[in-house]
């Protein structure tokens, strides 16, 4: 009896161990989460809840109304565990709780622990099913005995009269630290914010020492009282979890697609469509303060700004080349790896860029979404349209400060600058020739291997690169879409038109250092330079004849093959050379484009006009070495 009084005095001195004042049911202590709230808890918070539920039900299972309750109190010091003090507390009250079966609760605890471990092993999300099963044990008793006092109320009187004793079983060492860590993690990680219509749970401050209970109560109250901060921009609906917001967006946006009225492209968010629509409207709200250039996206402005600052933060680990954009670095890396992740489903051709695949796919579909407003011609790629619009004088022109040559886009002039800077990074290992771009080296390499992957479906002729095939196809179709605004002459390719325009402007930016002769294009200068060096790089494999020009080599080959690809529809006559075909066409059509400036006489060919002009000038260029006589 004295021992019991001493134990009672020690218990009263300990802070927070006073018995509860007033009636408290078991339901008030057993905190429950709804399914929506449960999904918002992270694994550490769920583990904390599990520990609380198991602790409560184990204590409930251990209560024996008619027996004594043994209590062990563990205390710790800085040096370690101290001696265990054991006391006996006899129960003075006895409560009859009917035929409630404590063994049933024990089985539910075992099933709950087993199911929890199975869910963890199978990486499944723990559900509330087993937790509800525990509280259902008391609910089922109440339904079976409607005449008796609710079991939860009776358990509340019995169970909570010993709550201070049960609290002593909670260790203040390792487990306490782990739970405290879980609570700290919960306060930092918890993002679920929700206003609940359910009544708030109030509990006496005397239970603050019950660490599990107070921690879970705090967690529960935070879930209830915080605002919803995750809002869907499309529907305006708010959520207390980012995961719930994502699920909502998938459901809401899954059936709601935004389609572009111009090109038919579909987007799942309205802001993406608005951004895309600027491509068609030409709207560019973002302006560079340095040069005044405008952009349709803020990210493009940020990337452009690095051109002024010279910042290139992205570096290739293979060749140390630096880039101003991360996307350019990723694209460049594929040169080293040889990766071509974008594959055509029709012909299985692979590409390094998604844009190249998109443009290539239009070859199969025949789609040409980019239309010229001047002439109505449509193109499969936007860059091709921009290049075409230069014919009409549309768009910004870029002028080279060194040779004053004009270009239709910034990329072309950047490549042109390398001519003056002699920046040639790519070298052919076979002949030692340098190239400004890797694509040029790839095309050049085919001259050594003899590879000609591009084939004409009309005549079966093959070519080293696609551009040559495109130019060749115009021979069969007769199409000449490029027209000179000065004289009305038409051409099959834009490069031919550019060369022709130099006749009217008189512009000849390329000068020969040997003889001072000037030319309107670099290729003509390179061809002329072979006259001084005597270089003849093109050799006939049949007769070993060499040529200084590739075109002469190609024309010569037809002597051996007998090929005559140029056919006159009027007289069913074929020619091996395009010039012969064109001359014959003028004869049939009566066209005489070449006019003498002195007498006004017109001729069908340029060579005929030159020969005629010698009559006026008196020039006699051809001399007989045997007799010394000269002729015009």
Curated annotation (Swiss-Prot):
GO terms for biological process: regulation of transcription by RNA polymerase II. Keywords: DNA-binding, Isopeptide bond, Metal-binding, Nucleus, Repeat, Transcription, Transcription regulation, Ubl conjugation, Zinc, Zinc-finger. Residues 24-99 form the KRAB domain. GO terms for molecular function: DNA-binding transcription factor activity, RNA polymerase II-specific; RNA polymerase II cis-regulatory region sequence-specific DNA binding; zinc ion binding. CDD domains: KRAB_A-box. SUPFAM superfamilies: beta-beta-alpha zinc fingers, KRAB domain (Kruppel-associated box). PROSITE patterns: KRAB, ZINC_FINGER_C2H2_1, ZINC_FINGER_C2H2_2. Gene3D superfamilies: 6.10.140.140, Classic Zinc Finger. It is found in: Nucleus. It comes from the Eukaryota. It holds the Pfam family zf-C2H2. GO terms for cellular component: nucleus. Signal peptide: none annotated. InterPro entries: KRAB (IPR001909), KRAB_dom_sf (IPR036051), Znf_C2H2_sf (IPR036236), Znf_C2H2_type (IPR013087). A zinc finger (C2H2-type) spans 230-252, 258-280, 286-308, 314-336, 342-364, 370-392, 398-420, 426-448, 454-476, 482-504, 510-532, 538-560, 566-588, 594-616. There is a cross-link at residue 220 (Glycyl lysine isopeptide (Lys-Gly) (interchain with G-Cter in SUMO2)). Belongs to the krueppel C2H2-type zinc-finger protein family. May be involved in transcriptional regulation. This is Zinc finger protein 860. It comes from Homo sapiens (Human). The gene is ZNF860.
């Amino acid at each position: 009896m004295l021992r019991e009084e001493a134990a009672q005095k020690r218990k009263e001195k300990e802070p927070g161990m006073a018995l509860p004042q007033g009636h408290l049911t078991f339901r008030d202590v057993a905190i429950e989460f709804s399914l929506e709230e449960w999904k918002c808890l992270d694994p550490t918070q769920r583990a904390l809840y599990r520990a609380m539920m198991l602790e409560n039900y184990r204590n409930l299972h251990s209560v024996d109304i008619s027996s004594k309750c043994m209590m062990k109190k563990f205390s710790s010091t800085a040096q370690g565990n101290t001696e265990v003090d054991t006391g006996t507390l006899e129960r003075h009250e006895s409560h009859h709780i009917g035929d409630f079966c404590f063994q049933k609760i024990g089985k539910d605890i075992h099933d709950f622990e087993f199911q929890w471990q199975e869910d963890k092993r199978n990486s499944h999300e723990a559900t509330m099913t087993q937790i509800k099963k525990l509280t259902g044990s008391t609910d089922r008793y109440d339904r079976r005995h409607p005449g008796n006092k609710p079991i939860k109320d009776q358990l509340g009187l019995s169970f909570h009269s010993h709550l201070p004793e049960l609290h002593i079983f909670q260790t203040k060492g390792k487990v306490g630290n782990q739970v405290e860590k879980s609570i700290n993690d919960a306060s930092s990680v918890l993002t679920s914010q929700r206003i609940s219509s359910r009544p708030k749970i109030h509990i006496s401050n005397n239970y603050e020492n019950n660490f599990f209970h107070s921690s879970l109560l705090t967690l529960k109250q935070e879930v209830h009282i915080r605002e919803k901060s995750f809002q869907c921009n499309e529907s305006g609906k708010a959520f207390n979890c980012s995961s719930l917001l994502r699920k909502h967006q998938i459901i809401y946006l899954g059936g709601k697609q935004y389609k572009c009225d111009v090109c038919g492209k579909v987007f799942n968010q309205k802001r993406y469509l608005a951004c895309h629509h600027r491509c068609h409207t030409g709207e560019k709200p973002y302006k560079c303060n340095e040069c005044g250039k405008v952009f349709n996206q803020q990210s493009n402005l940020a990337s452009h700004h690095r051109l002024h600052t010279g910042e290139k933060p992205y570096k290739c680990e293979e060749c140390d080349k630096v880039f101003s954009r991360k996307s350019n670095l990723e694209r460049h890396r594929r040169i080293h790896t040889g990766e071509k992740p974008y594959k055509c489903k029709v012909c299985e051709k692979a590409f390094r860029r998604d844009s190249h695949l998109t443009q290539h796919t239009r070859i199969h579909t025949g789609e040409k979404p980019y239309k010229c407003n001047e002439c109505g011609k449509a193109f499969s790629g936007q860059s091709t349209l921009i290049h075409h619009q230069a014919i009409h004088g549309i768009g910004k022109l870029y002028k080279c400060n060194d040779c004053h040559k004009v270009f239709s886009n910034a990329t072309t002039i950047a490549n042109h600058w390398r001519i003056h800077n002699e920046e040639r990074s790519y070298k052919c290992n076979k002949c030692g020739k340098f190239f400004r771009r890797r694509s040029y080296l790839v095309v050049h390499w085919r001259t050594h291997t003899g590879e000609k992957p591009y084939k004409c479906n009309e005549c079966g002729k093959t070519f080293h690169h696609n551009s040559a095939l495109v130019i060749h196809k115009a021979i069969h179709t007769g199409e000449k879409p490029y027209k000179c605004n000065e004289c009305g002459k038409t051409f099959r390719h834009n490069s031919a038109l550019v060369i022709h325009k130099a006749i009217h402007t008189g512009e000849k930016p390329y000068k020969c250092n040997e003889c001072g002769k000037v030319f309107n294009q670099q290729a003509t200068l390179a061809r002329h330079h072979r006259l001084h060096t005597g270089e003849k790089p093109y050799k006939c494999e049949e007769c070993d004849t060499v040529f200084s020009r590739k075109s002469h080599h190609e024309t010569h080959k037809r002597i051996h093959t007998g090929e005559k690809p140029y056919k006159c529809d009027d007289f069913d006559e074929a020619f091996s050379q395009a010039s012969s075909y064109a001359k014959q066409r003028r004869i049939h059509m009566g066209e005489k484009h070449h006019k003498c400036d002195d007498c006004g006489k017109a001729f069908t060919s340029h060579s005929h006009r030159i020969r005629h002009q010698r009559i006026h000038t008196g020039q006699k260029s051809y001399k007989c070495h045997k007799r010394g006589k000269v002729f015009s």
